[in-house]
Amino acid sequence: MASESSPLLAYRLLGEEGAAFPPNGAGVSGVPSSRKLSTFLGVVVPTVLSMFSIVVFLRIGFVVGHAGLLQALAMLLVAYIILALTVLSVCAIATNGAVRGGGAYFMISRTLGPEVGGSIGLMFYLANVCGCAVSLLGLVESILDVFGADATGSSGIQVLPQGYGWNLLYGSLLLGLVGGVCTLGAGLYARASFLTFLLVSGSLASVLVSFVAVGPRNIPLAPRPGTNASSVPHRHGHFTGFNGSTLRDNLGAGYAEDYTTGAMMTFASVFAVLFNGCTGIMAGANMSGELKDPSRAIPLGTIIAVAYTFFIYILLFFLSSFTCDRALLQEDYGFFRDISLWPPLVLIGIYATALSASMSSLIGASRILHALAQDDLFGVILAPAKVVSGGGNPWGAVLYSWGLVQLVLLAGKLNTLAAVVTVFYLVAYAAVDLSCLSLEWASAPNFRPTFSLFSWHTCLLGVASCLLMMFLISPGAAGGSLLLMGLLSALLTARGGPSSWGYVSQALLFHQVRKYLLRLDVRKEHVKFWRPQLLLLVGNPRGALPLLRLANQLKKGGLYVLGHVTLGDLDSLPSDPVQPQYGAWLSLVDLAQVKAFVDLTLSPSVRQGAQHLLRISGLGGMKPNTLVLGFYDDAPPQDHFLTDPAFSEPAEGTREGGSPALSTLFPPPRAPGSPRALSPQDYVATVADALKMNKNVVLARACGALPPERLSRGSSSSAQLHHVDVWPLNLLRPRGGPGYVDVCGLFLLQMATILSMVPAWHSARLRIFLCLGPREAPGAAEGRLRALLSQLRIRAEVQEVVWGEGAETGEPEEEEGDFVNGGRGDEEAEALACSANALVRAQQGRGTVGGPGGPEGRDGEEGPTTALTFLYLPRPPADPARYPRYLALLETLSRDLGPTLLIHGVTPVTCTDL
């Protein structure tokens, strides 16, 4: 539990020796700080190189040639709108607090929780793994175009053998080079990336100059794979220079077969390839653990990189459309080299871009994997990824990722992987947008990012656009990715994860609950929609576990509050003793599997504490209308924690994770004869207080004897037939007459019916006992009662019971303390209570009837079949001096009846209208 002194942010200024910690928690005990990268080297450079990847050199012609300039621009605009929406969300989350290693995974998991964050983090990791393989395959393709045995053109040095096995070998060798750089750490990676950035920038500059400086030329096209070069006439593509007719020819779409795969291209397939090249916006965020100031570097560097790459793509699209015919664009994806003033510089750019993109994907994947392993979401399967070097470099995660990339290289074809990689990236982007949307909708005061150029509209549009594009690109891959995410989330939920990160779902639920509680108007309540809202007062849950579960069954979709009064005076205590108890009571609710709130209070007496809880428990229109108490008798309390399987604890007294066992958090049951916290006088006074507050009252006796199968959560499969007996008559003031079922009697019928609707009680039969006066003819009253039950839609058996000469007739009286103040003496009341008890026991099969004024019973009944008995609870007497006598009569009335509920209802709860 957080205290007043608990910080809102875990941020330490000084270490143990007084040395200042690095910002954002960079310093880790025993591990040197690895936060060395600036905004430019840590975010701008890797993001630009990842967003260019091989697309900028090898797929510009592919996109423009198949889609045409207009559709290519539309694709680029759509792609960058999606990216921009996600970038806004990334910037908002990154500027709302300290960002540690793991990048997008860290943001998602700390917002949506470990289940969703872990599943999407693993998928984003796989997307980076596949992205690394795609970049390497593109690099192999570009190398073989020049140096392969089947390469065409006079500039080709045809020394490298080709084929699936050779291509796999080349990719594996390049992967070894990339993995070696990443294994040596982020510092070497940053220097290599900067060198690569310079090479790529120089290469792109030479290409842009070549579009203007080179004159028209014919460029020979290589024969398609699988064709005999000698039997196919030589074909040429044309570089026309800036030409208006070339631009007009390239404006519209011209989808054809991809000469590398033979597959027919469509808008979706071309967009997948283009978008895959633009999906590197998280490259900088993935390096969050190595950035000096990630909260500033991530938003600033990402925005700069996105704007720069968008401008370069637009420029290349226009230049290609103005100068190259469609045949050249569609049949020679590496035409930049053919039109360059110095072709080797383009080759250097291609190789450098592909290498840098693969390095960025591999090192980003390793950081995500290391963060997943540190959070221990997937157990020992990711244990090797926790290994770090002395400088904090997670080389174990790098080697782990290297092995997975090697497996992906077996797929072989660049465009084959593009759709899957794109869909996985889109899932991660949608999750980032959803995280920001959730934080914005939750309206939590601590969500106040310094980056404010976003709103819930941009977040929602980002989520929708990502999901739409997923299914547009590949419906199968999109459906499979969502299914995979669901399975991983279910796995993590079943396994359990850290709960200290915070769940935005809790903030969203609070926001929605508050909104609807304000709309829940008590002035609009109607008896048709009445439901029980219970406040169960418990002294020690060890002895009240069956009652705890029975009350959970009685609530029927209503409110259930578990209340407890701690005796004490806050003025004489150094701190509030109630707050530390909440955790134990919430654990009790979880283990007992009941749907209850917990409300604790501190009071000098139990009676005053009960008054507090009756007045202040609940909120708005959700406040208790019924008080439930255990019965006050001399029976020794039982410790149900010892016999209930849900509460069985390890021998050492600790639960999983090292937390104290629940059995150690509650005191042992009260020993027989020991003093009680509540006197008989205060017990009856508490009942009287509840009735004065217009609350219904339920007193539960002997609930520990309930059949265990009736307290289970599922349907009961008990072979024994059980009854639920209802006596809707004040047995301490017997009377006949046509109107004896009053408000309290109807409340009994309602509560018994509610219990019969619970699956565990479906097989139990509801019996209602109709008490007849000595001069009342049988049949007539039963007919009236059956008509009433029919109107109330209550299915039950009706059994007539004839009282002796002591029964009264007439309408029920509303006099408080009816039987006590009704003129009967104590001896007569005691005799009547004994007679009523014998009557009920006889109908249960617990014994035969005897005594004056007793009913006609059934002798020789075999064993009790009644699982639970509902009895009418009379009002307490008006004179507090008679409270002990009242309690003694209740004890006599309910003695040896087994599980019994004595109920007094004060509010109408039934309705016969539609």
From Swiss-Prot:
Cell location: Cell membrane; Lysosome membrane
GO cellular component: lysosomal membrane; membrane; plasma membrane
GO molecular function: chloride:monoatomic cation symporter activity; metal ion transmembrane transporter activity
Keywords linked to the UniProt accession: Cell membrane, Glycoprotein, Lysosome, Membrane, Phosphoprotein, Transmembrane, Transmembrane helix, Transport
Lineage: Eukaryota, Metazoa, Chordata, Craniata, Vertebrata
Stretches of the chain found on the membrane's Extracellular side: 58-72, 141-167, 215-262, 319-338, 400-416, 488-740
Pfam families the UniProt entry points to: AA_permease, SLC12
Region of interest (Disordered), residue spans: 645-678, 844-864
InterPro entries: AA-permease/SLC12A_dom, SLC12_C, SLC12A_fam
Domain of life: Eukaryota
GO BP, sorted A to Z: inorganic cation transmembrane transport
Keyword Membrane in annotation: yes
Keyword Transmembrane appears in the UniProt entry: yes
Transmembrane parts of this sequence: 37-57, 73-93, 120-140, 168-188, 194-214, 263-283, 298-318, 339-359, 377-399, 417-437, 467-487, 741-761
Gene: Slc12a9
Protein name as it appears in the record: Solute carrier family 12 member 9
Function of the molecule: May be an inhibitor of SLC12A1. Seems to correspond to a subunit of a multimeric transport system and thus, additional subunits may be required for its function. May play a role in lysosomal ion flux and osmoregulation.
